[in-house]
Amino acid sequence: MNKLENPLRDDVAGPAPRHQTTQVMVGDVAVGGGAPIVVQSMTNTDTADVEGTIKQIAALARAGSEMVRITVDREEAAAAVPHIRDGIRKLGLTTPIIGDFHYIGHKLLAEYPACAEALDKYRINPGNVGFKNKRDTQFADIVEIAIKNNKAVRIGANWGSLDQELLTKLMDENAASANPRDVRAVTREAMVQSALLSAARAEEIGLPKNKMILSAKVSAVQDLIAVYQDLASRSDYAIHLGLTEAGMGSKGIVASSAALGILLQQGIGDTIRISLTPEPGGDRTREVQVGQELLQTMGFRTFVPLVAACPGCGRTTSTTFQELARSIQDFIRDEMPEWRSRYPGVENLNVAVMGCIVNGPGESKHANIGISLPGTGETPAAPVFVDGEKFRTLRGENIAADFKALVIDYIEQRYGATPKPGAAQMVPAAE
């Protein structure tokens, strides 16, 4: 049979079953073990700047980050952590705070016990936790402090700071092999072994599996996919996904989405971070938004109402539909913090903003509420569809405001405290 003649799948399209992992509680957030995939982020403030760090953690949390990591790189930062935790809690936020430690984490956690107690999770990099004969001792020091404080730990190997002793050992063994592997393959193996050997050592010290999350980050998409596939096949630890040094703007978004999307589709990953390099003066919350959009687009979770909009073509020379799509999308994101508490389930809403008669009415009918704006040469009228039925036609200079009002009406009737049976209660205006 010609490959193009294969029958259509009759099963439900969707990702592979989730890789079964051991659930870890980070504060009050469940990671792994079948829990929803968690979106996390990281601050870029000087942690010693208590007020600045509180402000950014709050912004990230309100944008939807379910865990936030902060750098703890020196004594001033360690001393600031309890004050940051207290400030966040005073704002009514319970977002778990993760401490990111490199080189001197053992020293900071030991000398600043209030810091060790205030954090919800410690991140250890096995490539720089200690060197030569100090490595095992300093690693054990951090693990023992985690056990004492009942904290979770992420053992995070990174391509850029890989354990050089382990890498050298594997490279030497490979060179002596009758069938040597590619150097990149050996480096990937070193990444996986670094994470797994460190996890095994932590268990020997007494840290249970339900307190450990593993990651193995690289900056090349294909290598990242291979590393995490291998890591998942060889363990059942909870897994943190992320493409390190993804880059700025669209490049960073595309690279992270390509790598993480493939792994998530294969059932791999319990928590994700989109590591974007922000534009100068850019909004740090962008990485949270991208992470949410990735999970929502793939059907894993819902965070905000989806706005479908056509890309535009020669039939849509007017920018009206583009401006309306942007306006509606921004409007929804701005209102979501309030809507989330007032209208449970509103994140499942689908909105369509289309630009001409070709696909506009059809796409709008598939949405809960949609509008089809007139294309070039078409009658200057914008039909609105509600739950698949034509509801009203908008005209004039206030189409954007009128459509927003209809969206609000729909939300109030569908998701309000005493919801009416769907949007059918919305009364169409006379045409």
From Swiss-Prot:
Instruction: Describe how the cofactor binds.
Output: Binds 1 [4Fe-4S] cluster.
This protein's cofactor list reads: [4Fe-4S] cluster
Superkingdom to which the source organism belongs: Bacteria
Give the pathway annotation. Isoprenoid biosynthesis; isopentenyl diphosphate biosynthesis via DXP pathway; isopentenyl diphosphate from 1-deoxy-D-xylulose 5-phosphate: step 5/6
What segment(s) does the record annotate as region Disordered?
1-20
Q: Keyword annotations for this protein? A: 4Fe-4S, Iron, Iron-sulfur, Isoprene biosynthesis, Metal-binding, Oxidoreductase
> Into which EC class is this enzyme placed?
oxidoreductase
InterPro entries with a match to the protein in the record: Dihydropteroate_synth-like_sf, IspG_bac, IspG_bac-typ, NO2/SO3_Rdtase_4Fe4S_sf
Basic and acidic residues biased stretches: 1-12
Residues that hold [4Fe-4S] cluster according to the record = 310, 313, 356, 363
Kindly list the biological process annotations in GO that this record carries. Answer: isopentenyl diphosphate biosynthetic process, methylerythritol 4-phosphate pathway; terpenoid biosynthetic process
A Pfam family of the record is: GcpE
Q: EC no.?
A: 1.17.7.3
Q: What does this protein do?
A: Converts 2C-methyl-D-erythritol 2,4-cyclodiphosphate (ME-2,4cPP) into 1-hydroxy-2-methyl-2-(E)-butenyl 4-diphosphate.
- Family per similarity comment: Belongs to the IspG family.
Protein name in the entry: 4-hydroxy-3-methylbut-2-en-1-yl diphosphate synthase (flavodoxin)
Organism name: Rhodopseudomonas palustris (strain TIE-1)
